């Protein structure tokens, strides 16, 4: 089974990458910890930990005060907006910080819902995380009609014909995930945005799962909104929303009277998590530094981020192929999602399986005892597990690969699964 680890580790400098993450040195029951649980939250580099600690030591204050630590807090927040602007390909004042993607999406659904009523329609998909489903489905209480797009069960992809057929002149918003957090499918979001705009509807993209695996460019997508979570791309537990400036200024958020009416601050409820915002800049700079090590001639942050993802995509794809090919040799195993390596440009290295005779929880528990961290369940993609009729039996065993994972970890996982199944 060929791999490209040697070549790609040179391009990515895998030794340097792994040295940035202190958690990768952990052991469990004498086994090196292998973090294959990244779809639920990635590990963080030391610089993120340091940035959070440094803020609390030297800059801890509320905003807009007439003194040094408050000034520094303002500067740290502005710096993080600039960093996320480079990460997303947008202006800093189009970046909104929040508790998480779920709370940001509820806030936006409430604001957009103020303008909707009977006769209006919203298009959702059965592939999405519930955080990009339930906040919009709740608008049915206002008389809004909810249209649900089906999936192709054979490969867990969106039925694009069904999606196109459900968008019409009454459609006001189409919400879709960039990539499935359960089975790894990468959706054709650019086409979804085009279809939405052709009908005069807004396009809302959940990029939480895609963000650590590929470059984001909201200008190229022309989406109206895009949300992600920094703890899924090597940062602290926070949510980030991009909104076109025209929408952030026009829509009316629910907010406190004392809150500024200026955008993007008008969308940020209460006091933000300033220390985690400091960590966001550090995690974006980490990704950019990967790109600078790939191509030392690059200095600017946005080009460096793109260079990093160019290599991350190739490396993760090689790991994904090795894992998928290996899983298909395990008796009684069933892989959910795209399994043909020739189509892996349409999937993230997030693998969901079931193995006859073993519940996902049993498998995850036994793997965890060997230092192999995986997830079991539905991962809040409840519509998908119900459609595939696996919810009643514990959902899937999910394994997620990231650029800090190695071929050795993939091989350890496969050996462990074979031994567990053979007993």
Predicted regions and their residues:
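Pyridoxal 5′-phosphate
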Residues: 1-423
